[in-house]
Amino acid sequence: MRLRLCIYIYSLAVFYVKAPQLENYRAKHEHKPDTIRKEWYEMDKNILLTIEYDGSVFHGWQRQPDRETIQGHLETVLSSLLHTEILLNGTSRTDAGVHAYGQRASFTADVKIPVEKLALVINNILRSREKGSFAASPVRIVKAEEKPADFHARFDSKGKKYIYRIHNAEKSSVFLRNYVYHVPEKLDTDAMRRAAEYLRGTHDFKSFEASGSTPRQTTVRTIYDAEIIVNEESACSFKSMESEDSFKSSGAEPGGDRTSHRADRNIEIHVSGDGFLYNMVRIITGTLVDIGAGKLAPEEMKRIIEARDRTKAGHTAPPYGLYLAEVYY
């Protein structure tokens, strides 16, 4: 009897303290009863992070036991910072070696730190975990923002943009080995552009899904844009630092191209769409490279799409040239 009386008195106290605030909240969100229930009783903030990372030092995004992944790395830092277990909902499960400019991930927690300061605090902790006074973290939070309680980073996304980088040069650079796909054959970028036109629109992209992928309800996707960009003067083209004297002895002209007989080119393939199959961008890239190298005609792209057969498409480009550039909402 005493226990029931105590519970009753406590309930009345909570009601009289919270009721005015709840009524104000209800007036603004009458059309979202689920939101009221979740936000009011959990009292958590829903935080969306924009993340960039160097994928060459991780075993992909998704957490794995006994392996260092981006998701696991960040969850450890956030759980320690917020004194509670944090589970991130990422938009893209990038593979080992794949990088990101704009990965998005959300989580809910009772965050006391001002949201506008959260990215700075997390980045300071990430940096402190690295060895050496000048060591930089391979992961950085670009932005942190609060979203409505019913927001989900993955399920609410409207599309993504990927960039694939190719170093088209006779000789490769050791400094680029983890960040671009080196292709020594000169690529016909005009042919690649003609082929890319067939990708735009809504198609069944079964031919561009990795063999053995988990069966899914549909392999139909919409590609908003597919663009080939060429940069002849990229900062990624490393030149020799040898002296002019040693260069003259080789018979080359000072100031000339010291690495190859033709100008290095950095080619970027930009692909945006409402969703992507497993390895889809890498297989599209491999097919475009085969077309640029003259192994396939540009018109073959249309037949490859229609075939819905992985064996008809080109090779799978390596992961280290791929970047998750942006997630659309």
Where are each of the predicted segments found?
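Short hydrophobic alpha-helical segments enriched in small aliphatic residues
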Residues: 7-9, 17, 30-32
